[in-house]
Amino acid sequence: MGCVPLWAFADPDPLSVYRWTHRLLVVHVPDTDAGRATLEALRASLHDRREDVRARDLLIVPVGDLPRAGDSLPTAVALGATERLEVRRRLGLQDRVAQLVLIGKDGGVKARQSEAVFDLAGLLALIDTMPMRRAEMP
């Protein structure tokens, strides 16, 4: 009878640690002129709405070429290269397209955007319609 290492039972989903505690905004931005413009617009939106983002337990998970190490996004989660690749694979993100995926506290995909400018206000409004968020609201 052989032994099975404990790590064989670990959840390979790098985002599972956030399940039931946070909503996640997975951001895939390629290193292109358009990608840099998209990232700057998103960074400005996140800065302007930072209190709204925090109130919704929303963490930002960059998994693309941008932002680079040392660049900052409010409430960002730092993943290693292997984890970023695994998240992109699991979510079916395309390499050369800016994409955003909203993941609920239950771990399910709630929305996807592939835009030159992401609609953060629309995503925050969508979160407010979710049953778990409604239960959190005073």
Q: Locations of the language-model features?
A:
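Non-catalytic interaction/Regulatory regions outside core domains
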Residues: 2-138
